Amino acid sequence: MMKKSILAFLLLTSSAAALAAPQVITVSRFEVGKDKWAFNREEVMLTCRPGNALYVINPSTLVQYPLNDIAQKEVASGKTNAQPISVIQIDDPNNPGEKMSLAPFIERAEKLC
């Protein structure tokens, strides 16, 4: 009986840990569309961390970039190590001096929260 209780407890705690783990998806320029793609990479990963902190991750280097204010505050406070999103964000060819919109990526990442 004790072994079954311990096994049940371990299964519950491991499944709870899996649920608490941040979700990560990969999105590509092909999938999003060249006209909306905001990055200098062919694909990036998006994730939502506890507290709704959204990040873009470079799949080649695993460097992360804050996507919203919550994530930027985590980086500023030293809670998370990341580079500025401007490092991988491209210029908007239709609006000189402006960067491509991050809105489609923020929207996709929010669905992971």
UniProtKB/Swiss-Prot annotation:
Domain of life: Bacteria
Pfam families on file: DUF2511
One GO cellular component term noted in the UniProt record for this chain: outer membrane-bounded periplasmic space
Keywords (A to Z) from UniProt: Signal
Signal peptide: 1-20
GO biological process, alphabetically ordered: copper ion homeostasis
Record-linked InterPro entries: YebY
Protein name: Uncharacterized protein YebY
